[in-house]
Amino acid sequence: MGLFDIFKSKPAEQEEKKVEMQSDFSNFEQVTEYLYYRSGITDLSKRRLSLNELRSFSQREKIYTTADFLAKLKVDNEFYQEVLNIITVNETFFFREITELEWLVSLIQSSTGDYKILSLPCSSGEEVYSILILLDEQGVDISRVELFGYDLNSVMLERATKALYSERSVHKLSEVQKENYFFKNSNGIYEVIPRLKKRVQFEQHNIFELDGKNDFEIILSRNMFIYFDEVKRNAAVDIIVNLLKEGGHFIKGHADNIYKHPSLKNVCYGVYKKEE
């Protein structure tokens, strides 16, 4: 059975079967192609879980054909956002791939200037708060840094703004770190303290619609490129280079492959400097 066959009718209880017989999700590739055009995400045809979730979502919305799904996707921004939220869920946790974060902290610690830092995509915010915790632990005045988190997923951005995290999200933190930087409620949920939260601003953006120039000293874009084909990867790198100030640094994820941009010099594993 092909991956897109999951959108075809399946036997179930009698009433559901009656509705399913009217469904026609052939050519669902048209939907994934449109999502690629809008978001740059290319690997949907390989992700059975996301496709299953889209199938369930379409039934909840009482949409039973590819044509209707695609038509609504093009004109209904709220519907499009819900679809994006389904296909862009990315679980993360505090201190993930910490080596590069420690390098970032040492860079700021050894300088006297202020830093604008962008996490793109920021998911549910663990990365930016990890940076603040590490900076504060090293005695860096965190008023020197202004952090921004950009993401497509509105659900993830809401979580990041609330800064509420499960035990799993903070499992790499020490008990002292949890005590110093979080309030723990009666349900076992950890909330980041206000002193850190006020240093971060979260915004909804599509990387391919960003047109700023020389805005940031540091950009972290980790494990985003794995969702793009070569064309979109190269376009994303070009945009990141434009967003970086001269002499600024770009940090990629361990799983990311990027092309050798002429303005980027590799200074250590996963870290690149925009040459002045």
Which role fits each region the language model picked out?
Residues I258-E276:
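Core SAM-dependent methyltransferase catalytic element
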Residues G247-H254:
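Conserved beta-strand signature within the Rossmann-like core of class I S-adenosyl-L-methionine
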Residues G2-Y115, I218, L244:
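A short N-terminal interaction module
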Residues N234-E246:
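A short glycine-rich, Lys/Arg-flanked "PGG" loop and its adjoining helix->strand segment in the class I
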Residues D114-E127, E146-F148:
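Conserved class I S-adenosyl-L-methionine
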Residues S143-L220, M224-F228, K232, N257-I258, ...:
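Extended basic-aromatic, gly/pro-enriched interface segments that bind polyanionic ligands
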Residues S106-Q109, I133-E137, K162, N242:
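Short, well-ordered alpha-helices that flank and scaffold nucleotide-derived cofactor binding pockets
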Residues S124-V140:
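Conserved SAM-binding loop of SAM-dependent methyltransferases across substrates and taxa
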